[in-house]
């Protein structure tokens, strides 16, 4: 996917420094990406992104990065594992971790659909539960200290023709200078992400009005007609 990183008067990082970093980025792909990064001037940038704010625009860096459908990628990974002999079970919640001779030997799980409970025995365990990692750890170590610092990342979706971006755009939030993106997603533009501390239950996470305003302020600063 093509990305455009606009540079405006007063930005903390100019095109020269961005180019130096993007040479490293190109090198990480062994220079086998679709194309190497390019530096655009004011006119070229507006030719490619005519809805971008012209006032104070110095130019932009153009480069390529990868994108994926995260849900599809996850399902494909599970299906590939099953194809190699793994057993995949959905809608199971771990309620107890079992030990035998001081070592983990199994997990007590409950089917969230039927309510049935049963035990799964194993020799090796991987706690890949994302933001619920500490909750699962405490089934085995009730007094264990948290190892995660939870943060909330919010995206919003708006009609792409409302924003007017043709490429993925790198944005800096006016409020704190944080880097985020406006990414084309079919006929929508996905704007985000935020990154704020979060202390409630992961399953209760939701965007609030301040999150939405933070993201809208960022995209409006770059696309005034939006």
Region spans (language model):
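Helix-loop-beta segment of a Rossmann-like dinucleotide-binding subdomain
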Residues: 26, 46-84, 104-108, 116, ...
């Amino acid at each position: 996917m093509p990305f455009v990183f606009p540079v405006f008067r007063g930005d903390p990082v100019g095109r020269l420094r961005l180019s130096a970093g993007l040479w490293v980025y190109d090198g990480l792909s062994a220079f086998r990406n679709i194309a190497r990064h390019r530096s655009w001037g004011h006119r070229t940038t507006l030719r490619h992104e005519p809805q971008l704010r012209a006032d104070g625009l110095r130019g932009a860096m153009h480069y390529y990065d990868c994108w994926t459908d995260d849900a599809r990628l996850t399902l494909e990974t599970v299906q590939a594992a099953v194809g190699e002999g793994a057993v995949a079970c959905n809608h199971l919640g771990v309620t107890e971790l079992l030990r035998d001779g001081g070592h983990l030997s199994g997990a007590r799980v409950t089917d969230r659909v039927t309510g049935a409970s049963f035990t799964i025995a194993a020799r090796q365990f991987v706690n890949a539960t994302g933001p619920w990692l500490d909750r699962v750890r405490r089934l085995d170590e009730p007094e264990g200290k948290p190892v995660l610092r939870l943060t909330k990342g919010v995206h919003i979706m708006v009609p792409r023709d409302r924003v007017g971006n043709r490429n993925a755009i790198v944005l800096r939030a006016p409020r704190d200078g944080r880097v985020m993106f406006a990414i084309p997603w079919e006929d929508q533009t996905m704007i985000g992400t935020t990154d704020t501390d979060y202390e409630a239950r992961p399953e209760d996470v939701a965007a609030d009005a301040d999150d939405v305003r933070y993201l809208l302020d960022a995209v409006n600063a770059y696309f005034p007609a939006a």
